[in-house]
A protein has these predicted regions:
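Alpha/beta catalytic cores of nucleotide-metabolism and tRNA/nucleoside-modifying enzymes
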Residues: 1-46, 289-382
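An N-cap/entry alpha-helix motif that binds or orients negatively charged groups
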Residues: 1-69, 178-236, 372-374, 380
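Short beta->alpha linker loops
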Residues: 32-33, 110-114, 135, 258, ...
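Short, conserved beta-strand segments within well-ordered enzyme catalytic domains
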Residues: 49, 64-66, 75-79, 105-109, ...
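Glycine-rich active-site/cofactor-binding loop and its immediate structural neighborhood
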Residues: 72-111
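Short, basic, glycine/proline-bearing loop/turn elements
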Residues: 77-83, 126-132, 225-227
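Alpha/beta enzyme core
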Residues: 83, 97, 138-309, 317-321, ...
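A gly/proline- and charged-residue-enriched helix-loop-helix capping module
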Residues: 101-122, 126-140
Length: 382
């Protein structure tokens, strides 16, 4: 199987599994507890059907949308995800260049393996910095100031990782950042020699936003769950979020909102957007899927800030359903991470192109020529 054989999400996942050592593949692929929420994130879309219109003249389709004051050529963007160099040696460089090619937003994690300064010098398309609230206030201030100096357009505070989720696949495989060889993982790494060669020869693994402040994930092996549970400030509250919003002074979003009450409070503290997200099912198993919560959140605050539907998206039709419910855009991590592992920049570009092609085809079949044509009249819940 090669990149040219990848035509959808599942294909990219299969190729990623062939290329990555087991601990690293399962870090992407896994979720919390019994992974019920992880599965529901996608199956939720099956509970609603599309109602197409015909004879609408659909020769030209415009997929553009505007979020956080920036016009994107696509109604979806690449959500911030951590540790991308583990999945391909080009990591965020590959993803950023792919986002630039398609003029969509690129989300950069505080746990990125490439600095905001390098990303900013490399791409001029819209950029989001995703921020964790650490116990170390100096680290928090440094992250904000670096992202501001690098002219990032949006600051997104992740609010659903107050402690690490119970990711049992990681416990079984012994996944750590950086990777370490254990008896349980030795065979897996040995069977993926090209990954190992690239990892060892294509530059040092670093977390540039953290390395001057903490050792976790840089020169000390640690699990991501341990990082969340020990380094992040569990006393974080709405006053802290409001202060960060004011300190940033630009477009500010909360990533991980799942309730109407929290969406309303996000408006109150000055947020200009929220990501309706459960962290890809990686935190609280048994929680609702973003798509399940989307309508009531849009009804409550959709006219006051940008509502993004994040998670579980495998198809263009999933995006159409979320956009029809009122989301301003969609986003996700796995929707491009498998492609990154499968083929680097070329893989991410192929994945984006596939989603774009699906969206154009699906819009035409729906009788729509622009995103604003999509509405709830297009949907029927079962």
């Amino acid at each position: 199987m090669s990149l040219k054989d990848c035509h959808n999400y599942s294909d990219f996942r299969k190729l990623a599994k062939k290329k990555l050592p087991s601990p690293i593949f399962h870090y992407i692929d896994g979720a919390a507890d019994d992974e019920i929420t992880y599965a529901r994130n996608t199956s939720a879309f099956d509970d609603v059907d599309l109602v197409p219109n015909v004879l609408r003249g659909v020769e030209n389709v415009d997929l553009s949308t505007t979020i956080f004051g920036k016009k994107l050529d696509l109604p979806f963007y690449l959500a911030p995800t951590a540790l991308q160099r583990l999945f391909h040696y080009d990591g965020e460089r590959a993803v950023g260049k792919a986002a630039k090619k398609f003029n969509t937003m690129f989300g950069v994690s505080a746990l990125a393996t490439v600095s905001v300064e390098e990303i900013s010098s490399m791409i001029d398309t819209p950029k989001m910095f995703q921020f964790y609230f650490h116990k170390d206030r100096g680290l928090n201030d440094a992250c904000l100031e670096r992202a501001k100096a690098a002219k990032f357009d949006v600051m997104a505070l992740t609010v659903d990782t107050i402690t690490g989720g119970n990711r049992e696949r990681d416990l079984r495989t012994g996944f750590t950042s950086p990777p370490k060889l254990t008896l349980s993982s030795l065979f897996s790494f040995a069977t993926k020699p090209m990954w190992g060669i690239n990892y060892l020869t294509k530059g040092k693994f670093e977390l540039p936003h953290l390395q001057d402040h903490v050792k976790e994930g840089t020169d000390t092996n640690t699990s991501i769950g341990n990082y969340f549970s020990t380094m992040l400030d569990q006393s974080m509250n709405w006053k802290d979020a409001e202060k960060l919003c004011s300190q940033w002074g630009g477009h500010f979003a909360l990533k991980g909102i799942m309730s109407v009450d929290d969406a309303k409070r996000a408006v109150d503290i000055g947020c200009t957007g929220i990501m309706v997200s459960n962290h890809g099912g990686r935190q609280l198993d048994g929680s609702r899927a973003p798509f399940d919560q989307l309508a009531e959140i849009v009804d409550a605050v959709g006219d006051k800030l940008d509502v993004i539907c994040e998670g579980g998206i495998h198809r263009g039709t999933h995006m159409l359903k979320a956009l029809s419910l009122g989301a301003k855009a969609c986003s996700g991590g796995r929707l491009y991470l498998y492609a990154l592992a499968a083929g680097g920049q070329a893989g991410v570009e192929r994945a984006i192109e596939k989603y774009k092609t699906e969206l154009i085809r699906d819009m035409k079949l729906m009788g729509c020529t622009k995103i604003s044509d999509l509405n709830r009249n297009n949907l029927r819940f079962r």
